[in-house]
Amino acid sequence: MTADTHEVAVARLREAYAALPAGTPVRLAKPTSNLFRFRDVGPKGPDGPAAQLDVSAFGHVLRVDPVRRTAWAGGMTTYENLADATLRYGLMPTVVPQLKTITLGGAITGLGIESTSLRNGLPHESVTEMEILTGDGRVLRATADNEHADLFRGFPNSYGTLGYALSLTIDLEPVQPFVHLRHFPFGSAEACMDAIGQIAANGSFRGHRADFVDGTAFTPDELYLTVGAFSDVAPWRSDYTGQHIYYQSVRRDKEDFLTIRDYLWRWDTDWFWCSSGISTSWATNSRDGSWRRAFIASVKP
């Protein structure tokens, strides 16, 4: 999609929104959802379920600028597609939420977090401009210093109450081909939190640079911090896209190596923290995890 075709899509969406009867509840027409909560199909208006806006035209990466280290993408662009587009240039979004089907707009208006957040905060902190469809049908370009600065500051984590993000411009950061992981065990949450404090203060842990940090708690007295660092070389590369499950390696291996792309999606194959809750932990996994991902992604909370 080009800038011109994007503008055409914006105009068509505005027309579709304007054609809705006043007071009609609205929701986005999306093939998948990553909302981890129960909800009614509604909200329901006086004549039935909410109207659905077709936003499929806003799921494209519009531009990657490797010199300025920025990307311009539609709000419905999945992080998988966004990461693939930026990794070609040796760049990635400053925060990449852990599931491939999470969208850029969803992570901004919802709440996205990942293992670079200790350095880079939340996804919205990399946004420099947003194009937002508001409740009164306007499309506004909001930045930190223009006339819509209040909307720019208030939109993150507003869960769709202020409008829908049609496109966003975000900052990117450089990457290296591999990530070197080290898994550190802890016997209590207190000890684990103390270690996180050290990493936040020093940017490293036990002499190892901390480009990525996340934690896994198996029991109250068995916790692990995984500290990752970019690397140009890897003596081996693990593969967790099939039957080998990443979370099991956390307590088994002291260190590991992944390609940067495989690292970004290390949790995506089985979503272990929620799969048993929706009866998918028994599922036979395909080579690339697509069967299970498709099944889970089709479950609408």
Give the location of each predicted region:
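Noncatalytic alpha-helical scaffold of FAD-dependent oxidoreductases
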Residues: 1-301
